[in-house]
């Protein structure tokens, strides 16, 4: 199984298995034709590196019709961390159609681009607003700058649990090996975990799927996923998805998204035996899950 390497600011690394990465990106045209230069395009992808190649090669190679022959394009930013493909596609549609989105059409300032405002600034203003309203403001999202020339401050502050980082997204063989080592280490650590949940005191069946532990390696917390979620949501009636909280044993700050990411990671990562470059060349034009955003009608999240 492939590993996406996400290079964060400060040399911090995060790992995501292929099949668990869903991103909504913003392209900016660098065309020499003044009719197209500076125009923007919002799309969805499971593989940013491959997707930008498709856009720049044209619609015959998997790129969107709307971007064909209007480039070259730069992927300047991407929002990722969505729990599944459907939620990411809904976010993409709302970003493309703020005047039609139930969540966004109430904001008069998003109805049109302001005089002398660039297409990028307008799209950035839309996504800034989106990240502060429901249901997206509760998601553990990461805003990733891919081109430093476009980086700027958000006028509206983002929720505390969201991250703003810089760096490319790449698939590397070395990260696959690292993933296997970490998985083996996690498996070894489970041997010392309690077989009972610290919160409900019941036996944890199928611990490989349902047992959660603390992010603090020295903490011995062992509990059901649902028990920990209920504990973290104790003071948030009406909510079903935790965001942040503290460990019930050691008070270490916990980020629910990081717990889920680690659980997926611990469930096993297989190393592909074939050469990475050959695999990427073979797959780059058949990105089946990487739906193009020319789709006009996608249902929004229910109110």
Curated annotation (Swiss-Prot):
Gene Ontology CC terms: Slx1-Slx4 complex
CDD domains, alphabetized: GIY-YIG_SLX1
Principal cellular location given in the protein's record: nucleus
Reported cofactor(s): a divalent metal cation
Alphabetized Pfam families for the sequence: GIY-YIG, SLX1_C
Composition bias type Acidic residues, residue spans: 273-293
Localization annotation: Nucleus
GO MF: 5'-flap endonuclease activity; crossover junction DNA endonuclease activity; zinc ion binding
Primary role: Catalytic subunit of a heterodimeric structure-specific endonuclease that resolves DNA secondary structures generated during DNA repair and recombination. Has endonuclease activity towards branched DNA substrates, introducing single-strand cuts in duplex DNA close to junctions with ss-DNA.
Chain spans, region Disordered: 270-303
PROSITE patterns in UniProt: GIY_YIG (PS50164)
SUPFAM superfamilies cross-referenced by the UniProt entry: GIY-YIG endonuclease (SSF82771)
EC number(s) stated in the UniProt entry for this protein: 3.1.-.-
Subunit structure: Forms a heterodimer with mus312/SLX4.
Protein name, as recorded: Structure-specific endonuclease subunit SLX1 homolog
A GO biological process held by the record: double-strand break repair via homologous recombination
Domain GIY-YIG residues, every copy: 20-106
Family the UniProt entry places it in: Belongs to the SLX1 family.
Zinc finger (SLX1-type) residue numbers: 197-250
Domain of life: Eukaryota
HAMAP family named among the record's database cross-references: Endonuc_su_Slx1 (MF_03100)
PANTHER family in UniProt: STRUCTURE-SPECIFIC ENDONUCLEASE SUBUNIT SLX1
Compositionally biased tracts (Basic and acidic residues): 294-303
Keywords, sorted A to Z: DNA damage, DNA recombination, DNA repair, Endonuclease, Hydrolase, Metal-binding, Nuclease, Nucleus, Zinc, Zinc-finger
Top EC class, one word: hydrolase
Disulfide bonds: none
């Amino acid at each position: 199984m492939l590993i996406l390497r996400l290079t964060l600011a400060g040399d911090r690394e995060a790992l995501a298995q292929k099949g668990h990465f869903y991103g909504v990106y913003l392209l900016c045209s660098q065309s020499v034709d003044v009719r197209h230069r500076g125009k923007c395009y919002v799309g969805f992808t499971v593989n940013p590196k491959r997707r930008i190649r498709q856009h720049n090669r044209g619609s015959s190679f998997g790129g969107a019709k709307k971007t064909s022959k209007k480039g070259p394009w730069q992927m300047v930013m991407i929002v990722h961390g969505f729990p599944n493909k459907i939620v990411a596609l809904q976010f993409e549609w709302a970003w493309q159609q703020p005047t039609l989105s139930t969540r966004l059409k109430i904001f008069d300032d998003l109805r049109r681009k302001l005089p002398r405002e660039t297409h990028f600034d307008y799209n950035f203003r839309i996504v800034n607003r989106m990240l502060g309203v429901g249901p997206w403001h509760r998601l553990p999202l990461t805003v990733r700058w891919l081109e430093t020339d476009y980086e700027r401050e958000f006028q509206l502050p983002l929720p505390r649990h969201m991250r703003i980082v810089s760096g490319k997204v790449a698939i590397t063989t070395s990260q696959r090996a690292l993933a296997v080592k970490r998985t083996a280490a996690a498996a070894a650590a489970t041997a010392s975990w309690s077989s009972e949940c610290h919160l409900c005191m019941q036996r944890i069946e199928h611990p490989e799927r349902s047992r959660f532990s603390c992010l603090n390696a020295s903490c011995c917390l062992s509990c059901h996923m649902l028990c920990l979620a209920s504990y973290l949501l104790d003071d948030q009636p009406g909510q079903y998805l935790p965001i942040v909280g503290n460990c019930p044993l050691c008070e270490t700050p916990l980020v629910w998204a990081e717990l889920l990411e680690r659980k997926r990671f611990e469930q096993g990562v297989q190393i592909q035996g074939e050469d990475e470059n050959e695999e990427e060349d073979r797959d780059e034009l058949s990105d089946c899950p990487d739906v193009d955003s020319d789709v006009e009608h996608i249902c929004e999240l229910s109110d």
